Amino acid sequence: MTQGAVKTTGKRSRAVSAKKKAILSAALDTFSQFGFHGTRLEQIAELAGVSKTNLLYYFPSKEALYIAVLRQILDIWLAPLKAFREDFAPLAAIKEYIRLKLEVSRDYPQASRLFCMEMLAGAPLLMDELTGDLKALIDEKSALIAGWVKSGKLAPIDPQHLIFMIWASTQHYADFAPQVEAVTGATLRDEVFFNQTVENVQRIIIEGIRPR
């Protein structure tokens, strides 16, 4: 392959990547506002600046696009948990995980709300992911946390309930943002409130799992 051909291929690859990114971003905005059934592909295509035909070239159906968006959300959420290793200092690792989850709630509130909508609907289009890769990851990290408990590095808690509690307390600030703002007058976009939230959620959870 000539140098010119390589450059052309590289440009084409970047263009495809940028177009997919624009479609996924537009899909997240639209699905989180109207839900799966209330969204039309024409809306997403218009927001992404592509034709419907072009959209369907990359994502063959509305369902395929919706699942791609949800998988992208899961990848963002689960990356910090995937990084957990047995040699980590447990309290420091969990404390940092809480911060990262709150950063996700701050930076991707629409993603959190869309995922919540899917769960409330019974996860009809995401159940394979939940019972497959997600469950496998939670089983793996629960065993790791159980090892920390057994070695006395954490208080005697159930690992799955700890993970659920972290998810619930951090995602609340995205899923129920209007309620949080109505009560406190602030959102996670407010730097002072964000730091207060991180410190309080960390303290409440960490003090509950600190070995006595």
Curated annotation (Swiss-Prot):
Keywords: DNA-binding, Repressor, Transcription, Transcription regulation. Gene3D superfamilies: Homeodomain-like (1.10.10.60), Tetracycline Repressor, domain 2 (1.10.357.10). It comes from the Bacteria. InterPro entries: Homeodomain-like_sf (IPR009057), HTH-type_TetR-like_transc_reg (IPR050109), HTH_TetR (IPR001647), Tet_transcr_reg_TetR-rel_C_sf (IPR036271), Tscrpt_reg_pyr_util_RutR (IPR019915), Tscrpt_reg_YcdC_C (IPR013573). Master transcription regulator which represses the degradation of pyrimidines (rutABCDEFG) and purines (gcl operon) for maintenance of metabolic balance between pyrimidines and purines. It also regulates the synthesis of pyrimidine nucleotides and arginine from glutamine (carAB) and the supply of glutamate (gadABWX). Homodimer. This is HTH-type transcriptional regulator RutR. The lineage of its organism: Bacteria, Pseudomonadati, Pseudomonadota, Gammaproteobacteria, Enterobacterales. The gene is rutR.
